[in-house]
Swiss-Prot record:
Coiled coil: none annotated. Keywords: Cytoplasm, Decarboxylase, Lyase, Porphyrin biosynthesis. Its EC number is 4.1.1.37. PROSITE patterns: UROD_1 (PS00906), UROD_2 (PS00907). This is Uroporphyrinogen decarboxylase. The record marks D76 as: Transition state stabilizer. The lineage of its organism: Bacteria, Pseudomonadati, Pseudomonadota, Alphaproteobacteria, Hyphomicrobiales. NCBIfam families: hemE. It is found in: Cytoplasm. It comes from Rhizobium johnstonii (strain DSM 114642 / LMG 32736 / 3841). GO terms for biological process: protoporphyrinogen IX biosynthetic process from glutamate.
């Protein structure tokens, strides 16, 4: 099917649709009993990511259950440092961990074999495009260089990413080298996903919000702009969503300077400001995931507010970050029905 039949691709081209198409970040996840069952079969989390049979299954589960307008490849933003031999591991109750990198380690990093290492993920993309309904958009993704770098520097997640911020101040040249290497490798990875069958891709910058104004320009905007320019120079028709969580008022500059086709919004972005951003192009978001957990009027009012402010322009309805394990699957059903006008 051409892009004209896939609603999300139409919005990414600037079209306004009513009702808007929707998908949810982390829609394949622990809130679904069928996901938990497949996760138990797979073994480790990375085994789940790297085994196409399992990764395809968990990607398709929310499509079967809810009929979302997009399926997003089941993987993780940290597969790139894993491919760079940083010993990435996911421990229950601790989140992702890896061997922290220092200045010397950055100098010896090699990104040449990353895409080859991630062939199982690309096989998952190929199989998904074959198995998905023709009208369903297939989204690939990767992490933004800043967010991936924060984990590589600290070796784990931290509340405000202070280790990476400090490293960037003390070792500016090495840190810039790391960001640009990640930008180039990530662009190669996105091109490979597009070639394998992804209709569009999303860049996740989950920790953009901890950066000051100058650092946001240097660490969030510049590397992502480099990525997007690289992808589009090779695949001019590629559609790219960029999600810089916590970027706030800097999102207007972020859109202009990165060249993203659509901007993802977290739930803290005021809807009046979101409507201003929408005048420059498509937006995606931005329901608070806690409203999905709460259900009832909290869920209904959150949905209605977004549709009232953004529903007449190019909008992909989504959450402002990933759905949480505490979400009731029935609340997600109510969300889908209400966005589509059935509630």
């Amino acid at each position: 099917m051409s892009d004209t039949g896939r609603k999300i691709m139409r919005v990414l081209s600037g079209e306004s649709l009513s009702p808007p198409p929707l998908w949810l970040m982390r829609q394949a996840g622990r809130y679904l009993p069928e996901y938990r069952e497949t996760r138990a079969k797979a073994g480790s989390f990375l085994d789940l990511c790297y085994t196409p049979e399992h990764a395809v299954e968990v990607t398709l589960q929310p499509i079967r259950r809810y009929g979302f307008d997009a399926a997003i490849l089941f993987s993780d933003i940290l597969v790139i440092p894993d491919a760079m031999k940083r010993n990435v591991r996911f421990t229950e109750g601790h989140g992702p961990e890896m061997d922290p990198i220092d200045e010397a380690g950055i100098g010896s990093l090699n990104g040449e074999e990353v895409v080859d290492y991630l062939r199982p993920v690309l096989e998952t993309v190929r199989r998904l495009r074959e198995e998905l309904p023709a009208e369903t958009t297939l989204l690939g993704f990767c992490g933004a260089p800043w967010t991936v770098a924060t984990y590589m520097i600290a070796g784990h997640g931290t509340p405000d990413q202070a280790p990476a911020r400090l490293f960037a101040y003390k070792h500016a040249r090495a840190f810039e080298h790391l960001l640009m290497l990640l930008a180039d490798v990530s662009a190669d990875y996105l091109v490979a996903q597009i070639d394998a069958g992804a209709d569009a891709v999303q860049i996740f910058d989950s920790w953009a919000g901890v950066l000051g104004e100058k650092e946001f320009e240097a660490f969030a905007i510049r590397p992502v702009a480099r990525m997007i320019a690289s992808v589009k120079s090779r695949r001019p028709h590629a559609r790219i969503i960029a999600f810089a969580k916590g970027a706030g008022y800097q999102l207007k500059t972020y859109r202009q300077k990165t060249g993203a086709d659509a901007i993802g919004l977290d739930w803290s972005v005021p809807l009046a400001f979101a409507a201003e951003l929408q005048k420059d192009g498509p937006v995606q978001g931005n329901l608070d995931p806690m409203r999905v957990v709460a259900g009832g009027r909290a869920l209904e009012e959150g949905i209605d507010d977004i549709l009232q402010h953004l529903g007449n322009g190019p909008l992909i309805f989504n959450l402002g970050h990933g759905i949480t394990p505490q979400a009731d699957p029935e609340h997600v059903r109510l969300l889908v029905d209400r966005v589509r006008g059935g509630a």
